[in-house]
Amino acid sequence: MARSISSQGLLSRRRLLGASAAFGAAAVLPGAFRPLTVRAEDVTLTLVAYSTPREAYEQLIPLFAATEAGTGVTFEQSYGASGDQSRAVESGLPADVVAFSLEPDITRLVKAGLVDETWNTDEYKGMVTDSVVAFGVRAGNPKTIAGWSDLVREEVQVLTPNPLTSGGARWNIMAAWGALLKQGKTEDEAKEYLKQLFQHVPVQDKSARESLQTFIGGVGDVLIGYENELELARENGEELEIVIPAETILIENPIAIVNTSANKEKAQAFIDYLRTPDAQKVFGENHYRPVVKEVLDTFTFVNPATLFTIADLGGWADASTKFFDPDNGIVAEVQA
């Protein structure tokens, strides 16, 4: 069973009987005359996540519920901009499992005592999916966008979300910065590039999903975003093309258990399930790059000429302050 909620209030409520998707069992609908009987072993987990994996989790939750470990487990779900979701949990939004866009949104909860310091010591370093930063362009690529230099041409408008709220926006900025360095530019030249880039951004939405909707609505020539988000939009019939720049960053998406969970064993079972080949295949079918190599190898993804990681740029501990300090960071400086 799954219910979708928002950290700012109820957005939608959905009742999904865990195994019904797999076995066609009848669901008890809200308002039915017969009360739902809850077994003593049944538990509810709350998943608080960033916006883009919603479709994947709505497929995975009933599949987990159909496993022995997931028997009797129902879910409440909350999706939104990664930074906003992390701050909401820090401020008291109930959560058992958090799945965010980037590591600093977990680190915030570690500092608050809400996530164990050992959250990223497993073989996957706390990650559940990967992706890359890509460009979405209009059908036919009328602006002939091929690489980062094309985004600052005079006639080009670019969409990227707000880095104060969106994890995806931070990945985009680090991708641009790293690409310039990989091209042999200096940090001063990379900073000047970011300044020019933001001059081409007409609107900064709160999340990657909202930024995609703005692009679909006709604003902008290029959308910088998650490869998986762009692929999903194209699969759903949106008229866009995807460009993988020669230099881009590997996006690494973390997941963790919240210490205040009353059901840590089931929460861990859910995370363990998400790293099984079956679950990773579902992520791959939703255009994420699986973190389980044997599953990754069964998919065909475009391999950029130069793929770098956040570790290559000094890691998030350094980047969070250097780039995203709201008063003194590089992003604040180039947008002043």
PLM-predicted stretches and their roles:
Residues M1-L11, A19-G31, L36-V38:
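N-terminal secretory signal peptides
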Residues A40-T165, T298, P304-T306:
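N-terminal segment of the mature folded domain
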Residues M127-S131, L194-F198, D205, R234-Q268, ...:
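Periplasmic-binding protein-like
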Residues G140-A146, G178-T186, S261-A267:
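Short helix-loop capping/hinge motifs at secondary-structure junctions, enriched
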Residues Q183-A246:
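Ligand-binding pocket segment of bilobal, Venus flytrap-like solute-binding proteins
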Residues E265-A336:
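Extracellular/periplasmic juxtamembrane helices and adjacent flexible linkers that interface
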